[in-house]
């Protein structure tokens, strides 16, 4: 794909007949009038100069609507403080573009492709438009290969697909960002490929923490970061995921690499779209969301895919408003996913981390034809025991555990051990717990849970299973409590 010019070059080369005038400013919404026959296309980037003292800057606007009578309605990607009516606006003739190439790794960019850690860096690189079509259908290649993470609960019950779309669902404060950072630590280190991180509408502090952690882990050199955080206008938060995805597409299509794309948080992308939709005066749809919600989500998700011989593996954090999974924002995301990991407040309250709900999480490749008969059998037995334990909760709460049959008592004790054994020390939480993160190979995970479901560890105290790694850790913890495996 041909390179596009940078914003500065576009501005300098603009002709007088591609300029218009600001006629209305309402927050981030700017109406611009152009000469007849020179109305810019939808998604074109426009530039306006703010010359008001300390607010002086070049403002980037994106065309969102054609209003008729040579008027266009645009959304600003920066604060419009200091912008006044009558200011000249230049049509660049192109949509917003971001730098691509191997050199973007190790740096932080914003949604416009401007380098934040080294101002001016990347302006002379090849640029790609952030508005691109997904690969043609005949180039797509479905993947069923498992991506091993070393987290027991994930590898056993919700195996991730290499080249697939994975989402971490959860309400506020249940550990989505920590788990995303954990996956970056684990997969980026073991994966050895290129990673792209999109910070969409989340906390600036978390972005800074991630930057420092990646440097300390020596993974930053293989990672490109693109941020549009909470304090940014809705136009930026709506486009930052596309900017990061465009960089990832270059690594997939031009460099022929397998790429990891992390997005935190996909709900903020939807939320920004809702804000923009309201600002543009569109009639809201269900629960106040934009009527174009499914289209906008599809445009993003359809580009995250595997083509012949190369892939983009996407891991997305999804905030669930008020823990309501029927909310249109998370519900629209479900349809595009290969694996879902649901973080539960009830699991979190037990102190089990990661707080994954094993009964609510799922994966399309948890199938004997993909993961193998043994893995599938053990996973289904674990799910059966946990489901039966859940069914017995009401009886235990009302009548007490003593009223259960001997068989059910044994199952409950086994289920409590399974629950605790699904917890694990995480690398991202080392500074809080003082315990090093543990990685458990898939083969060992399957063997350990197979023995656990068969009752081989029924004599081991429950607390021995809490926040440990594999069988070696279990043996040490059991011995410290006066038991042997």
UniProtKB/Swiss-Prot annotation:
This is ATP synthase subunit beta. Belongs to the ATPase alpha/beta chains family. ATP binds at residues 170-177. Produces ATP from ADP in the presence of a proton gradient across the membrane. The catalytic sites are hosted primarily by the beta subunits. Pfam families: ATP-synt_ab (PF00006), ATP-synt_ab_N (PF02874), ATP-synt_VA_C (PF22919). Disulfide bonds: none annotated. PROSITE patterns: ATPASE_ALPHA_BETA. Residues 1-20 are annotated as: Disordered. Keywords: ATP synthesis, ATP-binding, Cell membrane, CF(1), Hydrogen ion transport, Ion transport, Membrane, Nucleotide-binding, Translocase, Transport. Its EC number is 7.1.2.2. It catalyses: ATP + H2O + 4 H(+)(in) = ADP + phosphate + 5 H(+)(out). It is a peripheral membrane protein. GO terms for cellular component: plasma membrane; proton-transporting ATP synthase complex. InterPro entries: AAA+_ATPase, ATP-synt_VA_C, ATP_synth_F1_bsu, ATPase_a/bsu_AS, ATPase_alpha/beta_chains, ATPase_F1/V1/A1_a/bsu_N, ATPase_F1/V1/A1_a/bsu_N_sf, ATPase_F1/V1/A1_a/bsu_nucl-bd. GO terms for molecular function: ATP binding; ATP hydrolysis activity; proton-transporting ATP synthase activity, rotational mechanism. It comes from Mycobacterium avium (strain 104). Residues 1-11 have a biased composition (Basic and acidic residues). It is found in: Cell membrane. F-type ATPases have 2 components, CF(1) - the catalytic core - and CF(0) - the membrane proton channel. CF(1) has five subunits: alpha(3), beta(3), gamma(1), delta(1), epsilon(1). CF(0) has three main subunits: a(1), b(2) and c(9-12). The alpha and beta chains form an alternating ring which encloses part of the gamma chain. CF(1) is attached to CF(0) by a central stalk formed by the gamma and epsilon chains, while a peripheral stalk is formed by the delta and b chains.
